[in-house]
A protein has these predicted regions:
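Basic, alpha-helical nucleic-acid-binding regions used in initiation and control of genome expression
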Residues: 1-3, 11-32, 168-169, 184, ...
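Class I (Rossmann-like) S-adenosyl-L-methionine-dependent methyltransferase catalytic domain
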Residues: 1-73, 109-199, 452, 460
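Short, glycine/acidic-rich beta->alpha junctions
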Residues: 44, 88-92, 297
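A short glycine-rich, Lys/Arg-flanked "PGG" loop and its adjoining helix->strand segment in the class I
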Residues: 94-108
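Class I S-adenosyl-L-methionine
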Residues: 104, 117-120, 130, 137, ...
Length: 498
């Protein structure tokens, strides 16, 4: 009988050679750093604890089977990674989540297996609200939305999705909003120095923190936003922050600073729109002080900022609006039914399209291995495509995809890794921005392929085999990102690159 099954939970613990995905993300987002303490609740073999300790993070872990004698201690960051999946008793599952939360000072990381496609029934047996695997371990698979509701209800919180099946739960509401706002911040770099005046050179050290602040926030700092010593030094030398910034403007291109300010105002629009999409928008005084200063600087009032964000969010309900935005986008590769954008160029899309993608990534989390994002035009869907060899292969093959339907909120996964004839990419430079390190190399190859007429029959070259066959017919071989011409039965001998 099912009741007589003895579930061997410890057999679900995995041996890893690297940090687990939830911990890796926490490190990337600087949730975990050398100044934080870390506790792994249900650490298994203790791999994450060992690796974080080697990174000089104060770490400890407990596991009922492998480390039962380790004391349960509170920490800044607590990890409950893939534990909820393996507990067959629903009351014990809830208790584990709540215990981990009680140990959390700042951020609780919750990770669980989620359903992204139908589960194979082979060698599995229904058990409770999950399945028993062939290894005699219990597995509870959640829908992504179901997992968030479970965490929110059990802890009375608003968990933040970071990736599929991975959530950060913040103790401090303002820290949560800071994290969200940082998520939507597009990448920019400080304008380069064009004319180093004597005053700039003499005060370079004092001015650098001001340059960094404006680059990050797109505005001048309010009193108290800079480190006290930094602010004091600037005021002693220049009498005011504004006068100090004038010295920076004299050494740089003012238009570039205006562009940064504009980009940051768009980031705030995206943030406010997607916070409203996820849940009820916080009141102005509930926002972190820095975000309040951002809103005042760019919009004047919170109401005006919200009206601009809401206008864009609500317009997404009209497919013609999305279609027009995709068709006029200066970033990405356009096709009749979609806009394809490299992950590094997402922040350069206009706010409407960033909000469109955010409706998927902020509810479900963005898949970690995303290379290309596909924004569908004719239906509310976002696809995340994985091309592991994008940089090195001239025409990389699709390995996997995640498709999120924004109407049904269903997730589907496609696995192309075993296909003998997978889809491939052409014109790689169209997916990225001109600032991408290999943009020129990609563009040069495309120019050569166009000159040789290799794109004249697009229906024949969309897959690896079709493309290779076409190249062979034209006596052309590609090595790296260079074309070589050869004669039949003769080794390639000449690069076609000018």
């Amino acid at each position: 009988m099912l009741e007589d099954l003895a579930i061997e939970r410890h057999r679900a613990a995995m041996f890893r050679t690297d940090l687990s995905r939830p911990i890796k993300l926490a490190v990337e987002f600087e949730i975990i750093n050398t100044k934080t303490t870390f506790f792994d609740y249900g650490c298994g073999h203790g791999g994450d604890v060992k690796r974080l300790s080697s990174m000089e993070v104060n770490s400890a872990g407990w596991d009922p089977y492998y480390k039962p004698d380790t004391p349960l201690i509170s920490a800044d960051v607590v990890n409950l990674g893939y534990i909820l999946n393996v507990i067959e008793d629903t009351e014990e599952r809830l208790e584990s989540l709540q215990k981990a939360w009680k140990l959390t000072n700042k951020v609780l990381i919750v990770a669980a297996q989620v359903l992204v496609s139908s589960i194979s029934s082979k060698n599995q047996l229904a058990y409770g609200d999950g399945v028993v695997t062939s290894r005699n371990t219990f597995q509870k698979y959640y829908e992504q939305g179901e997992l968030k509701k479970y965490i929110d209800s059990a802890l009375e919180v608003d968990a933040v999705p970071v990736a599929l099946g991975i959530y950060f739960v913040f103790r401090d509401e303002q820290e949560k909003e800071n994290f969200r706002a940082e998520w939507y911040r597009s990448g920019v770099i400080a304008p380069r120095i064009r004319l180093a005046t004597k005053k700039y050179e003499d005060c370079k050290q004092e001015l650098e923190p001001l340059i960094q602040f404006y680059t990050k926030r797109g505005r001048l700092p309010a009193p108290g936003e800079l480190e006290p010593e930094v602010e004091e030094n600037i005021l002693l030398e220049f009498a005011s922050i504004r006068r100090a910034f004038k010295v920076i403007l004299q050494a740089t291109d003012e238009a570039e600073w205006d562009a940064i300010a504009y980009r940051r105002s768009l980031d705030i629009q995206v943030y406010l729109a997607l916070v409203q999409f996820e849940e009820e928008r916080p009141r102005f005084l509930e926002l972190p002080e820095k975000i309040r200063h951002d809103i005042k600087a760019f919009f004047g009032t919170y109401r005006d900022a919200c009206e601009v964000a809401d206008e864009k969010l609500f317009s997404l309900g009209e497919s013609k609006v999305i279609k027009a935005a995709c068709k006029t986008s200066k970033i990405g590769k356009q096709t009749p039914d979609a806009l394809y954008v490299h992950i590094t160029a997402l922040g350069e899309l206009e706010p409407l399209l960033r909000i469109y993608e955010g409706c998927a990534s902020r509810v479900f989390g963005r898949p970690e291995e995303t290379t290309i994002v596909k924004l569908h035009i004719n239906q509310p869907r976002i696809s995340y495509l994985y091309y592991p060899d994008f940089d090195t292969d001239a025409h990389p093959a699709l390995k996997a995809s995640i498709v999120i339907d924004l109407k049904t909120f269903r997730i589907a996964r496609g696995d192309y890794s075993k296909r003998k004839n997978p889809p491939i990419l052409h014109r790689k430079e169209t997916f990225v921005s001109p600032q991408y390190p290999q943009y020129e190399e990609f563009a040069r190859l495309t120019e050569q392929e166009v000159e040789l007429g290799l794109y004249e029959n697009p229906s024949h070259i969309g897959t690896r085999n079709g493309w290779q066959k076409y190249l062979e017919q034209r006596c052309i071989e590609i090595r790296g990102h260079q074309l070589f011409e050869f004669e039949h039965d003769i080794t390639p001998h000449a690069s076609l690159e000018n």
